[in-house]
């Protein structure tokens, strides 16, 4: 029921404050109404050559008339302040603190127009309290035909005001006929009142004076300077006001401005996670009920016994830099020592490996440079930190996208129980527990959830062993537990790790370990992925397929690796990823619910026909079911944990700035930038060799390409 020009102005005003007219419909209607009243207030009112105020409804082209009212409302902020400033300069009227709506050339005063769905008196007082200016005239209209103005001076004649009241009544009727009036009437918020300046005295005052920026003598002096800051002057001016050294040219950011991120060249990047992901193979027992069930070593031996295809191991993909026979000997030693355990009367709860030469080599025993007390060497003239090589650039390889896709998939087992995501501390309100249950149902079978539980188990076991058996080369089975579709419990063994010496004093002190993990993946298919591994062939496994049983070689992926107390602490807390992705989903539900003005949790999860945007790929925006969205968000969170690195930290922080600028452009907010080149540099210096960061950068490029089409 508003004309297109008013609608357009209102949309622009809301976008300027980052609000969406489609979501905040009541606010949108209020802005349209207010604009229309301001325009009607000024319509037909002129000042003639004798400076008399007259009303002219039909245009007489030869009359020398000047508009009686200057319209300030409806202009963008910069323009509006320019108009206000020029009026103040030419008329000498005091400059208002807030942008008024109109200026009256006859009475020489600014006017603040209010349109309220509440009591006119209430609203009038709020307005007066907010603007605190004797000089600005206030005029309030209501939808019920009441009005109130400063000193009961209504500025306009009866007829002009009646026109406005009639229009407001019409708007109310139109809204009521569409069932919108009640919600509109109830949604009005009071004016935010700005508190009086309160005095700061005593200690706080001294602290305030001490903490001023340089060149300011007192708090008053600084306040005056800040108050003189035009809130909507151009940024260049502000910067030069702040410092003489800064000179920034604001460049408009257009669809053609951004270029794609430059991904590094070089050999393809390699796998660097602490354990195998999509390539892992499990030896499993169902419904475990053996003696000592739950003791990792007992479980591991039981799992090992389910496999009968062991054979003499041999190296199929050597590690470029390592002494490969040592990896082979290490595996043989594990098999032999497990055999020894079984020959004992009573199986021990933990197993410490013999400190053989192959294990000492693999675990870097005695490799650390000797530490010397600083007192003994501070006189050495050329004392310096030894040079470390720049990391070698690596290019994006396709395996990391495959890893991510696999992490989003469903497995045939459930990896968490319903109450895994946080226990109810208080009687949680019904909606929250309902959301949690829906979400858990979508992600409990997800492969990313398996990675969480595997990571939690491995880090907990390793941290325990690091503290409990500092000097020992302890054998730690890599285990996880799940439930089958039929609800039967299952214990899985992925392989083993052997921990090195672990006198961890600081959070960042490193404990070395050797990991040995089962797999059916032939490393020769993507040798670049396995650069850091030595891979052995250790057996043949019979697999049931559609065409009957086939035999596949079983591989063992062996590598040396390291971690620290702080990394293990975070690894133990990987369940947080479930919470993080649940919160992201909740904010999507909240957005839907606020549009529909009711809780949309049930519809959100149960409307199977609806698709949601998941991410960008070179093909465009990918869409999927709500379950797929849950699993994708979870997988992202899990990969951020599995592939955590300084490169990821830097890339996330810096690329976010670029993302916000691109989104502002998408929302037609006309963003401007300075030193965009510097921002690109900051993002690109994080693109070195990390597979997850490189994948995110390539996704980012897809986003840029589509967002700015």
Swiss-Prot record:
Which residue ranges does the UniProt annotation give for the motif Nuclear localization signal 2 (NLS2)?
177-240
Would you tell me the Gene Ontology cellular component terms?
Answer: host cell cytoplasm; host cell nucleus
Please list the disulfide bridges.
none
List ligand-binding residues for Mn(2+) 2.
73, 101
PTM summary from the entry reads: Phosphorylated on serines and threonines by host kinases, including human casein kinase II.
Per UniProt, where does Mn(2+) 1 bind?
A: 34, 101, 112-113
- The encoding gene is PA
Question: One of this protein's Pfam families, by short name?
Answer: Flu_PA
Q: What is its EC number?
A: 3.1.-.-
Its Gene Ontology biological processes?
A: cap snatching; symbiont-mediated suppression of host gene expression; symbiont-mediated suppression of host mRNA transcription via inhibition of RNA polymerase II activity; viral RNA genome replication; viral translational frameshifting
The kind of enzyme this is, by top-level EC class, is: hydrolase
Signal peptide, first to last residue: none
Q: Which InterPro entries match?
A: INFV_PA, PA/PA-X, PA/PA-X_sf
How the protein assembles, per its UniProt entry?
A: Influenza RNA polymerase is composed of three subunits: PB1, PB2 and PA. Interacts (via C-terminus) with PB1 (via N-terminus).
Task: Tell me which cofactor or cofactors this protein depends on.
Answer: Mn(2+)
Question: Superkingdom, according to UniProt?
Answer: Viruses
Compartmental location: Host cytoplasm; Host nucleus
Annotated motif Nuclear localization signal 1 (NLS1): location in the chain?
Answer: 117-132
Name recorded for this polypeptide: Polymerase acidic protein
Identify the species of origin: Influenza A virus (strain A/Teal/China/2978.1/2002 H5N1 genotype W)
What's the family? Belongs to the influenza viruses PA family.
UniProt GO MF annotations = endonuclease activity; metal ion binding; RNA binding
Q: How is the cofactor bound?
A: Binds 2 manganese ions per subunit.
Write the record's keywords in alphabetical order, separated by commas: Cap snatching, Endonuclease, Eukaryotic host gene expression shutoff by virus, Eukaryotic host transcription shutoff by virus, Host cytoplasm, Host gene expression shutoff by virus, Host nucleus, Host-virus interaction, Hydrolase, Inhibition of host RNA polymerase II by virus, Manganese, Metal-binding, Nuclease, Phosphoprotein
What this chain does, per the entry, is described as: Plays an essential role in viral RNA transcription and replication by forming the heterotrimeric polymerase complex together with PB1 and PB2 subunits. The complex transcribes viral mRNAs by using a unique mechanism called cap-snatching. It consists in the hijacking and cleavage of host capped pre-mRNAs. These short capped RNAs are then used as primers for viral mRNAs. The PB2 subunit is responsible for the binding of the 5' cap of cellular pre-mRNAs which are subsequently cleaved after 10-13 nucleotides by the PA subunit that carries the endonuclease activity.
